[in-house]
From Swiss-Prot:
Cofactor dependency: Mg(2+)
Top EC class of this enzyme: transferase
Residues binding Mg(2+), per UniProt: D100
Function of the protein: Transfers a GMP moiety from GTP to Mo-molybdopterin (Mo-MPT) cofactor (Moco or molybdenum cofactor) to form Mo-molybdopterin guanine dinucleotide (Mo-MGD) cofactor.
Protein known as: Probable molybdenum cofactor guanylyltransferase
Species for this entry: Geobacillus sp. (strain WCH70)
Enzymatic reactions: Mo-molybdopterin + GTP + H(+) = Mo-molybdopterin guanine dinucleotide + diphosphate
Length: 195
């Protein structure tokens, strides 16, 4: 069993962005490729979790494993993606990144990965007082609790945290520059990063 697998969450509707964010380009690379490269520094196996309508497009652009959410929980957000990968692979830990944080650094991912240990169920960034649940590492023992939440249609990440032992990593212990957490949700935000 591999100790850790990577997950790129790329299944959102991108309504505010107007087109699938995963395929926006920054510095000549698709957003999802930046996330894959960041994870590649700490994991061997990487899964891209996406919407069924985008699966073929991803498969044309990458050799990574591309999957869609378990159909029972499709449309329930990041928790559904994390659950699906936990069911798909045997890794003990799942390192999660969203596809829309083009400033996330491989060095930051490597630093966060060092916090994974058996005392915790999840390692989550709490950067400058803001919890960043989509930049985190989840132990597979959280899978049953995630499934319970999904069955109850409670797809809030914070609901999971109430039921598990979370280690919050702050900026002094992770990464001082807040820009690594800058995500892109709108065309204006995209214009800001490319100009």
């Amino acid at each position: 069993m591999n100790k850790m697998a990577g997950v790129v969450l790329a299944g959102g509707q991108s309504r505010r962005f107007g087109s699938p964010k995963a395929f926006a380009k920054f510095n000549g690379k698709y957003f999802f490729e930046i996330a894959v490269e960041t994870l590649r520094t700490v994991v061997e196996d990487i899964y891209i979790v996406s919407h069924p309508s985008l699966i073929d497009c991803f498969r044309q652009k990458t050799a990574e494993k591309v999957i869609m959410d378990d159909e029972r929980y499709r449309g329930q957000g990041p928790l559904a993606g994390i659950y699906t990968v936990m069911k798909e692979c045997e890794a003990e830990w799942i390192f999660v990144l969203p596809c829309d944080m083009p400033y996330m650094r491989p060095e930051a991912a490597a630093k966060l990965a060092k916090y994974a240990n058996e005392k915790f169920d999840a390692i989550i960034c709490a950067h400058f007082g803001r919890i960043q649940p989509l930049v985190g590492i989840y132990h597979r023992r959280t899978c049953k609790q995630i499934e319970k939440l999904l069955q109850a249609q409670d797809n809030r990440m914070k609901s999971l945290f109430r039921h598990c032992h979370v280690h919050y990593v702050n900026e002094q212990d992770f990464w001082e520059d807040e820009i690594v957490f800058r995500n892109v949700n709108t065309p204006n935000e995209f214009d800001d990063i490319v100009t």
